[in-house]
A protein has these predicted regions:
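Hydrophobic, aromatic-enriched alpha-helical segments typical of multi-pass transmembrane helices
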Residues: 2-243
Length: 243
């Protein structure tokens, strides 16, 4: 009984630092989504030619600055994701400190993997740069190596997404338990996060499945993060009604 009263007291009180952290999280959700989409859709996707390593390498070499801008934007996005992990931890720590910490750690692991993974971009740039010490390789070999490292980067993203999905699942469970946001939104977050983690794991085991599903399995997560970001900015966290 004492424990129940204690949990009720925690869940029905929102500290100023939680409100600030919720606002920060809302901004980061929306900004990170916008920057990551810009980096992929504008700065990188136009350079990639599926099934044609030679043309892809030529495009990257001809648009080196644009490719670098996309890579740097990705790095800044991953840095903001670390801020998001801390902000969510601050908001949801009163609900369950240990689970909030676990979720934050998983999100930080995601940030770390994706940040290190960006080294592949700069290896690709070296391979297509025409540097003297690479003349021991012929052009086709360099183009194939560039495509290889770019493919490795794609696998690195998938590994990071597993931890993103796991961390987001736990945070969503805490959102549901706290009732700081609508339960429907929190429930959708659990669903979207599990889909991201599970489907990504399946793709890592069965790579050809990735060609079949494309990026559609990420759509639920997109709508969840945009919806949550807007809610936190417009409504903030609310005191749950205890019945």
């Amino acid at each position: 009984m004492t424990k129940q009263r204690h949990e009720s007291a925690i869940s029905s009180t929102i500290e100023p630092e939680q409100r600030v952290a919720a606002t920060v999280a809302g901004y980061v959700y929306l900004i990170a989504m916008a920057t990551s989409m810009f980096a992929e859709i504008y700065a990188r996707a136009p350079l990639m030619v599926r099934g044609n390593a030679a043309q892809t390498a030529i495009n990257i070499a001809a648009n080196e600055r644009l490719f670098r801008i996309g890579s740097v934007i990705h790095l800044l996005t991953f840095a903001s994701d670390a801020v998001l992990a801390v902000a969510l931890y601050v908001v949801l720590r009163p609900v369950n400190r240990n689970l909030a910490l676990l979720a934050a750690v998983w999100r930080l692991v995601d940030c770390s993997i994706l940040s290190v993974n960006m080294l592949n971009d700069f290896i690709v740039l070296r391979l297509v740069s025409g540097t003297d010490y690479l003349r021991v390789f012929d052009t086709k070999q360099l183009q194939a190596l560039a495509r290889l490292f770019y493919s490795v980067e794609a696998s690195g993203f998938q590994i990071g997404f597993v931890f993103l999905g796991l961390g987001s699942t736990v945070f969503s469970v805490l959102w549901l338990k706290s009732r700081y946001i609508p339960r429907a939104l929190a429930g959708w977050g659990i669903f979207a996060s599990l889909v991201l983690a599970i489907v990504t794991l399946v793709i890592l085991v069965f790579p050809t499945l990735g060609d079949a599903v494309g990026l559609t399995y990420m759509a639920p997560m997109f709508f969840y993060e945009v919806g949550l970001g807007l809610w936190l900015l417009i409504k903030g966290v609310r005191i749950p009604v205890v019945t």
